[in-house]
């Protein structure tokens, strides 16, 4: 068949027919066994999920980037899914988590990668990028903006407590006490995931939205709504996948990310004043509650990230950016990757 005919035929094939197969395997990194999902061949892109999620949160991004000629890898992060989950919160500092991603790049035989992170994955991504600028050549942050650490300050958990009026608590404060939140969240994983995914999403009634500040006499599931109908972006089989994994593992691993914040703060004073220097794309939903309480970081992003390629807020989109608006995220992601060449 003539070369031109082959190219024309490829152009007419649907995306699914052109997309390499999604594969799963285990690798040893940084002292743990890590499960990864991977797709495609080419330059490496690593996708880092947040709380309470899994590699599965990138299910719409993996095939799009793979079809465009990238080797795309989405791990179950430390403490999640099929990856090892050490019990000690001290094993979940950002230094440990960044080390995991460095290990992924090495295990796959690469010297460089583009790193993307959503929610808790964003701090992992920008910490890894700041510590290893030789390895991570560009950064994509979803939901959580980068902020330059200032001089002085107090431990994160103390700062959270001081910001709250009497009788109120920040959700991350509620997560600090071992055994409390994990017992509540694990009581019915399917209901938990349904409520969390719905209540932090965009384009839902105001009264249904997640309250990240709540009474000291309340529990975290008191702050979210169990929907009568799922939003269009969320399918029953999606909830089933998450629920099956969390029913097996519990939520302790993910909660340990919050419980290690003070230790991370004490370990990373050397990053005071450090800006994020790599080319960076930031995407968030206009309805994302994180955009509300991280407004300072968002407003100063251009100063904190001198090579910010673009800052995009997607209308009608909430916290679960790449799940709620995969077409927009994939388009922006691919445009950004193209700009790096």
Language-model regions: role of each:
Residues 1-6:
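Bacterial N-terminal signal peptides that target proteins for export
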Residues 10-17:
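Hydrophobic h-region of N-terminal signal peptides that target proteins for export
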Residues 18-22, 33-34, 80-116, 120-309, ...:
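Flexible "cap/lid" subdomain of the alpha/beta-hydrolase fold that forms the substrate-access gate
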Residues 23-29:
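Short acidic-hydrophobic surface loop/beta-edge motif
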Residues 32-33, 38-84:
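Conserved HGGG/HGGXW glycine-rich cap/lid loop of the alpha/beta-hydrolase fold
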Residues 50, 93, 324-325:
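Active-site helix-initiating loop/hinge in glycosyltransferases
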Residues 51, 55-58, 120, 126, ...:
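Signature tryptophan residues that serve as conserved aromatic anchors
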Residues 308-341:
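Catalytic active-site module of serine/aspartate enzymes centered on a nucleophile-bearing elbow/loop
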């Amino acid at each position: 068949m003539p070369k031109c005919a082959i190219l024309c035929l490829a152009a007419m094939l649907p995306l699914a027919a052109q997309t390499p197969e999604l594969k799963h395997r285990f690798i040893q990194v940084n002292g743990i066994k890590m499960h990864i999902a991977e797709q495609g061949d080419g330059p490496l892109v690593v996708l880092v999920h947040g709380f309470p999620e899994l590699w599965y949160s990138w299910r719409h991004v993996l095939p799009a980037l793979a079809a465009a000629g990238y080797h795309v890898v989405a791990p179950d992060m430390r403490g999640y899914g099929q990856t090892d989950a050490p019990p000690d919160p001290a094993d979940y500092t950002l230094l440990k988590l960044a080390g995991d991603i460095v290990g992924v790049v090495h295990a796959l035989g690469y010297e460089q990668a583009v790193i993307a992170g959503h929610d808790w994955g964003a701090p992992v991504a920008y910490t890894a990028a700041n510590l290893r600028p030789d390895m991570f050549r560009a950064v994509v942050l979803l939901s959580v903006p980068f902020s330059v650490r200032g001089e002085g300050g107090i431990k994160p958990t103390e700062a959270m407590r001081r910001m709250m009026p009497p009788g109120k608590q920040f959700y991350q404060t509620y997560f600090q006490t071992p055994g409390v939140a994990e017992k509540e969240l694990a009581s019915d994983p399917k209901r938990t995931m349904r409520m969390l995914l719905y209540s932090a999403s965009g384009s839902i009634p105001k009264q249904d939205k997640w309250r990240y500040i709540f009474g000291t006499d309340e529990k975290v599931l008191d702050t979210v709504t169990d929907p009568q109908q799922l939003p269009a972006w969320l399918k029953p089989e999606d909830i089933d996948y998450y629920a099956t994994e969390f029913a097996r593992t519990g939520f302790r691993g993910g909660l340990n990310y919050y419980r290690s914040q003070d230790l991370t703060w004490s370990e990373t004073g050397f990053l005071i004043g450090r800006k994020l220097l790599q080319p960076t794309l930031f995407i968030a939903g206009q309805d994302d509650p994180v955009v509300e309480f991280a407004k300072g970081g968002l407003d100063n992003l251009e100063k904190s990230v001198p090579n910010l390629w673009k800052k995009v807020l997607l209308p009608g989109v909430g916290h679960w950016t790449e799940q709620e608006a995969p077409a927009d995220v994939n388009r922006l992601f691919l445009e950004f990757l193209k700009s790096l060449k």
